[in-house]
Amino acid sequence: MALLQIAEPGQSPKPHERRLAVGIDLGTTNSLVAAVRSGVAEPLPDARGRLILPSAVRYHADRAEVGEGARAAAAQDPLNTIISVKRLMGRGLEDVKQLGEQLPYRFRQGESHMPFIETVQGLKSPVEVSADILRELRQRAETTLGGELVGAVITVPAYFDDAQRQATKDAARLAGLNVLRLLNEPTAAAVAYGLDKGAEGLVAIYDLGGGTFDISILRLTRGVFEVLATGGDTALGGDDFDHAVAGWVIEQAGLSADLDPGRQRELLQIACAAKERLTDATSVSVSYGDWRGELSRAKLDELIEPFIARSLRSCRRAVRDSGIDLEEIRSVVMVGGSTRVPRVRSAVGELFGCEPLTDIDPDQVVAIGAAIQADALAGNKRGEELLLLDVIPLSLGLETMGGLMEKVIPRNTTIPVARAQEFTTYKDGQTAMMIHVLQGERELVKDCRSLARFELRGIPPMVAGAAKIRVTFQVDADGLLGVSARELSSGVEASIQVKPSYGLTDGEIARMLKDSFDYAGDDKAARALREQQVEAQRLLEAVQSALDADGERLLDEEEHLAIAAQMDSLRELAGGSDTAAIENQIKRLSQVTDAFAARRMDATVKAALSGRRLNEIEE
């Protein structure tokens, strides 16, 4: 009798055979696929040896043409040649209309307000267009590697929201790809440079692609990246440089800005080519129609300076949000083809005070990092590196006011991992905070597992809500959880370490998960009630404090009685279980105290400015 060989899904029936997995950088302008071969991560070429695949799709009546040929046809067939589709992913028709001047396509609204593009092959959604690009990359990889892929790690901008991330997953599924993980582009870049294996410290990832800009500030501790802050702009990139140069050509040539789609696409291609040549040259000739002109690098710098300045503002904001100084950042990684522009590199170097890392091709660095991650997730690593495949079985979080569980690291998150979240004080003058670390999927503390408690003391006394306490959860490759709390203005800090999985059997984990599903509706309602009760108590205490301080001075008797009546109503309702009634009464009390709050603010400002000269205020 014959024996059937049964392999686990996604795994080879031969335990020592490498599983084929790739990293994909699905970019706005260009896309790449990379894989680890002979221990080295490298981009995979097509049959003609080209590594970069332009993110362009041209639709014919019976087929889709992807890549170089499609991009070359953009000027002659602009309505059927879709480029920069990444800008449309996960967006509604109203969002797309805001990009209308830059996009020559005809749009139709589909279900759920999804935009569809009219082509000779029929209506195409952004997901379908992206799927055609991913399908081309999948076929390239399978041809080059000589086998079927078990999966791919696909990178996305850190700024992508849930809708954009889901659209990317949908496109991959249409292309026949199993998504091992969506990886943020900044993290992929850091992995490509091996910064996860280097010295501990702070790293900035400056990612300026064709259509999106991301800045991320990362802290590396014991091989774990903690994202301190992210920022950026989903509508800023090399495309804007091209439009700026195109606008300059129109002005110099005395042309009308109202060009038809074909001429607009042709002009943008000329502008892009001029920009790229100025990476090495100090001046280039530009021609469009009968017009001939000279574009210098200095002029290009002038044209794109507003866009560079926008990116640097985002950088400063991200550094400020992370609570560090610029001088503390030890490395700056440059990602994206637009970072080849000399002025971009020099401006970033000036801001951070260090030479940016540009050793790896900025067009390839994200795909290379994704390939390294894909190789690990496919199970090709041996020894300690396999710890990367461990996941957190139950969510980790802490207790907030009202006995609520606030999840910081969701279950099934791969370790090692670090996540930070900011919290604040509940009462005026609060100088200490109890951090209660929890594990579980339920909404209320009483239904979760208590892991540890510790106190943060020495918080400067402030009004409720003014203090900022950053709580960081970090799980290392051995599953050891470290929780630290730091008050940002004073720097006071406290921490604890605990083994989250200790003492839990697989059966207990399964039971906790089952309970979270069975009681999901009840838990959601209970959480909503607790949140409104906590907000009611907070508002009552704040109003009472204000009345004690300024009530007699700023309110007449009628106003005082009106506020007191609304407070009594809220106290009564807050003790009950009618969530909607509590919420409505909170609104009524807020409305009746609006004028009182405004008077207090005016009095505070007047007192602060009293006795100061105008020039002192302006300074």
Curated annotation (Swiss-Prot):
Gene3D superfamilies: 1.20.1270.10, 3.30.420.40, Actin, Chain A, domain 4, Substrate Binding Domain Of DNAk, Chain A, domain 1. The keyword RNA-binding does not apply. Signal peptide: none annotated. Keywords: ATP-binding, Chaperone, Nucleotide-binding. It comes from the Bacteria. One of its GO terms (biological process) is iron-sulfur cluster assembly. InterPro entries: ATPase_NBD, Heat_shock_70_CS, HscA_NBD, HSP70_C_sf, HSP70_peptide-bd_sf, Hsp_70_fam, ISC_FeS_clus_asmbl_HscA. Pfam families: HSP70. SUPFAM superfamilies: Actin-like ATPase domain (SSF53067), Heat shock protein 70kD (HSP70), C-terminal subdomain (SSF100934), Heat shock protein 70kD (HSP70), peptide-binding domain (SSF100920). PROSITE patterns: HSP70_1, HSP70_2, HSP70_3. One of its GO terms (molecular function) is unfolded protein binding. Belongs to the heat shock protein 70 family. Chaperone involved in the maturation of iron-sulfur cluster-containing proteins. Has a low intrinsic ATPase activity which is markedly stimulated by HscB. HAMAP family: HscA. NCBIfam families: HscA, PRK05183.1. This is Chaperone protein HscA homolog. It comes from Pseudomonas paraeruginosa (strain DSM 24068 / PA7) (Pseudomonas aeruginosa (strain PA7)).
